[in-house]
Swiss-Prot record:
One of its GO terms (molecular function) is DNA-binding transcription repressor activity. It is found in: Nucleus. Belongs to the E2F/DP family. Residues 543-552, 794-805 have a biased composition (Polar residues). Residues 113-182, 261-347 bind DNA. The modification Phosphoserine is found at residues 71, 102, 413, 417. SMART domains: E2F_TDP. This is Transcription factor E2F8. In contrast to classical members of the E2F transcription factor, atypical members contain 2 DNA-binding domains and regulate transcription in a DP-independent manner. Both DNA-binding domains are required for DNA-binding and are proposed to form an intramolecular structure that is similar to the winged helix structure of the E2F-DP heterodimer. It comes from Bos taurus (Bovine).
Length: 866
């Protein structure tokens, strides 16, 4: 079996008898295979020549293939052709040849070019509508319906409608809907176009181009390439800048540049083409001249011949529509180089007076104004401003430029200073302007420089008091008393007012809390260096009968030698040891002793600060009847603080109603900054600050070395309910002190809230504790008697002590030198100065009316701060 299979497989005679099967002809070779005759079963058909598919026969072969693949109509048409193909080879070839040779006949069956021309189509379009339609009738035009009825593409209808819209014969309603106006507005728009063309000197441009064409005998291509720069150069020499290419009127139809789509629209070009007919003296315009003028207006420097011919073709379309409107007709102009096609104006004659009325429709006075305004709008939209170069810009770049300009406008219009609040400065509720806070450091520095240039003077500054108080007599100082100088009234809601011009560098900030409607103030005081003053014997703080509370704070600087202060007690009833507080009954006696002369002089509000450590006294020739307590302020500045944080420590205590002059509720405030004066919300006799006006403040200032200044509020500042007091922020204090040169840049001031304070009666004064220099001086803190504290509590007067930011040294026996800093951060070791003690140096100090605290030297160093 295997041998038989092998024999069958290798039998050559059987192979010779077998016939090779024919390949199935593909669809592309079906015609050739059918045409070829059958020469016998053994012959192999000739293979048709294969054509490489990489390179198409024509440039549009691939495009046709893609279109046939996408368009179902073309694909179906090809399929139908394939179905109707006759498989008979010779007959199919004859049919194909007949179809090829009958191409002209097929074109003859289609509409001719003349029938498809825009002019004929425009005639058909205009025949559908009357020349002067009735405005009461609906005259809307749907372009889709018109294109379907006329059996043309819609774009052909758009070409007609754009030219008609340029003459205001139609107006656009929607994307493909227009309203037919006919020739009602034709004369009016022609008058406007003529006047605008005369203003832009179109006639002179036409004459200039004709003159150059006569002079230059070149062909159209050469003349076009050479005449443009020649004309531009000669127009400047002839003194006609309006005809220069850069300044020739262009198009400005709400577009970014003249090369945009709207500027090249058929509507704008039609208006300019009609304008050329209206302004030319022989109203004959060739398309070449019109194309040159319109090309120059486009400000295109690199136009080639193809663009110029494109412009001429567009003008031909416009001319066909205008010819259908019987406005122009085609003529030929004979020139040296031959005949040239041109068009002659056959439309209505337009009078040179543009204000002539339209003969068709009656016009009123309002119509004349509307006509003039329409003329201006047309001139503005049709022609650009002179002397404004235009550049090509893509719409995406327009949006980018607009966004950049808007950002630049926002940056330039942004306020460079803090916002100002516009309120009446005269009212009590006016808010200070924040913009001056930014200039605070510069103003203070300038004032300090001015003051440093002047010689040091001891000036007594007296500010005008309230209406019911008299002026306070000046105090003589050991260094030749100077005449009084009235400081400027602190009427402005914000500002820097020097309390005393003195070129001293250190400063003590004093916080003045205001009412909730206002802001806090900080007084930066500059203590003097050398001289101190003590009031003469017999002087005691005078109390104004009309006030509801008083505050007397007197602080003395202690001596390093620890002198015995018993010898100083008979000299002055106000010189006290540190830490002694006046009991209630004895202080009332002191008030009664001075009440009679105080009533004679009128109610006076003052505060006394003295320095008993230096043992300097007032001059003996001071008048005795002037028993007026004065506040001795060094030079300083009143600085309002608009942004403050509320103090964490505030205490309130209702006093007994046994005294009719006392207000029911008062609160005492302690400052977290060492060296800052705490202020009571009750009225203090030392200083009177009405709301947003510091004029009633009386400051009798002498160059004393002080550590704290009593500050008070007026009745306007007192409220029936307690409110938190604001504390200046650290940034404001550090910024101001550093720019004033008061502290070094490395030193930072902390203004965080300090420990709470003990409740105090409104009749008890606010007590300020000032740090003392522990390195050079040892202070003696006199201790209060417990019996005095109990006596004050039984009388309804509780003892008050402010939260000091540093420990107060005790008596020299047990005192330990503690490193203290000028500005201490809150939370350090504290000791209430008003704590009841048992050690007193003498019995005379128990009858004193003020609390004296040892003073330290105002020396600030970075080591102390850290």
């Amino acid at each position: 079996m295997e041998n038989e299979k092998e024999n069958l497989f290798f039998e050559p005679h059987k192979r010779g008898l077998m016939k090779t099967p024919l390949k199935e002809s593909t669809a592309a070779n079906i015609v050739l295979a059918d045409i070829q005759p059958d020469f016998g079963p053994l012959t192999t058909p000739t293979k048709p020549k294969e054509i490489s598919q990489g390179e198409p026969w024509t440039p549009t072969a691939n495009l046709k293939m893609l279109i046939s693949a996408v368009s179902p109509e073309i694909r179906n048409r090809d399929q139908k052709r394939g179905l109707f193909d006759n498989r008979n080879g010779l007959s199919d070839v004859k049919d194909c040849l007949h179809e090829h040779f009958s191409g002209d006949e097929y074109e003859k069956s289609q509409p001719s070019r003349k029938e498809k021309s825009l002019g004929l189509l425009c005639h058909k379009f205009l025949a559908r509508y009357p020349n002067y339609p009735n405005p009461a009738v609906n005259n809307d035009i749907c372009l889709d319906e018109v294109a379907e009825e006329l059996n043309v593409e819609r774009r052909r209808i758009y070409d007609i409608v754009n030219v008609l819209e340029s003459l205001h014969m139609v107006s656009r309603l929607a994307k493909n809907r227009y309203t037919w106006h006919g020739r009602h507005n034709l004369n009016q728009i022609l008058e406007t176009l003529k006047s605008v063309g005369e203003e832009n000197k179109y006639a002179e441009q036409i004459m200039m181009i004709k003159k150059k064409e006569y002079e230059q005998e070149f062909e159209v291509s050469k003349s076009y390439n050479t005449e443009d720069p020649i004309i531009k150069s000669n127009t400047g020499q002839n003194g006609h800048p309006d005809m220069c290419c850069a300044e020739r009127p262009g198009v400005e139809l709400r577009a970014a540049s003249v090369n945009s789509r709207k500027d090249k629209s058929l509507k704008v070009m039609s208006q300019k083409f009609v304008t050329l007919f209206l302004v030319s003296t022989p109203q004959i315009v060739s398309l070449e001249i019109a194309a040159k003028i319109l090309t120059w207006e486009d400000h295109v420097e690199d136009l080639d011949r193809s663009k110029f011919k494109t412009k001429i073709r567009r003008l031909y379309d416009i001319a066909n529509v205008l010819s259908s409107l019987d406005l122009i007709k085609k003529v030929h102009v004979t020139e040296e180089r031959g005949r040239k096609p041109a068009f002659k104006w056959t439309g209505p004659e337009i009078s040179p007076n543009p204000s002539g009325l339209s003969p068709v429709l009656p016009c009123a006075a309002s119509d004349l104004e509307a006509r003039q305004s329409s003329k201006e709008n047309c001139a503005k939209n049709l022609f650009s401003t002179r002397g404004k170069p235009n550049f090509t810009r893509h719409p995406s770049l327009i949006k980018l430029v607009k966004s950049i300009e808007s950002d630049r406008r926002k940056i330039n219009s942004a306020p460079s200073s803090p916002i100002k609040t516009h309120k009446a400065e005269s009212t009590q509720n006016s808010v200070p302007f924040r913009s001056k806070m930014a200039q605070l450091a510069a103003i203070c520095k300038m004032q300090l420089e001015e003051q440093s240039s002047e010689p040091r003077k001891n000036v007594t500054v007296q500010l005008a008091g309230s209406g019911h108080c008299k002026s306070v007599a000046p105090l003589d100082t050991p260094a030749n008393a100077e005449p009084e100088m009235m400081a400027p009234s602190l009427i402005q809601p914000l500002g820097v007012v020097p309390l005393l011009p003195s070129p001293l560098s250190p400063a003590v900030p004093v916080i003045l809390p205001q009412t909730p409607s206002g802001t806090s103030y900080a007084i930066y005081l500059q203590p003097a260096q050398a001289q101190t003053i003590t009031p003469p014997p017999g002087l005691s703080p005078t109390v104004c009968p009309t006030t509801s509370s008083n505050a007397m704070i007197s602080e003395d600087s202690t001596d390093a030698t620890g002198e015995n202060a018993d010898s100083d007690a008979p000299k002055s009833s106000v010189s006290t040891r540190p830490g002694s507080l006046l009991p209630g009954p004895e202080r009332q006696g002191a008030k009664n002793r001075e009440r009679e002369p105080a009533r004679e002089k009128g109610s006076k509000r003052a505060s006394m600060l003295e320095d008993s450590g230096s043992k300097k006294k007032f001059k003996e020739d001071q008048k005795a009847p002037e028993n007026v307590s004065t506040t001795l302020f060094p030079s300083g500045y009143l600085i309002p603080l608009t942004q403050c944080s509320t103090l964490g420590a505030e205490s309130i205590l209702s006093s007994n109603e046994n005294s009719g002059t006392l207000s029911p509720n008062h609160s005492i405030y302690s400052s977290p900054i060492a060296g800052v004066i705490p202020v009571t919300s009750s009225e203090l006799t030392a200083v009177n600050f009405p709301s947003f006006q510091v004029t009633p403040l009386k400051l009798m200032v002498s160059p004393t070395s002080m550590a704290a200044v009593p500050v008070g509020n007026s009745p306007a500042l007192s409220s029936s309910h307690p409110l938190p007091i604001q504390n200046p922020s650290s940034a404001i204090v550090n910024f101001t002190l550093q720019h004033l040169g008061l502290i070094s840049p490395g030193v930072q001031v902390s203004t965080s809230p300090g420990p709470g304070t003990i409740a105090v009666s409104p009749r008890i004064e606010a007590v300020s504790v000032t740090p003392e220099n522990a390195g050079a001086e040892q202070g003696r803190a006199t201790k209060c008697d417990a019996s005095i504290l109990s006596q004050n509590q039984t009388n309804g007067q509780s003892f008050a002590g402010t939260g000091a930011q540093q420990p107060v040294p005790v008596t020299p026996k047990g005192s330990q030198p503690v490193a203290e800093s000028f500005f201490r951060t809150p939370g350090g070791p504290t000791k209430p100065t008003g704590s009841p003690c048992t050690d007193f140096d003498g019995a005379n100090y128990t009858s004193v009316g003020t609390l004296l605290v040892p003073q330290r030297k105002l020396e600030v160093s970075v080591e102390d701060v850290h």
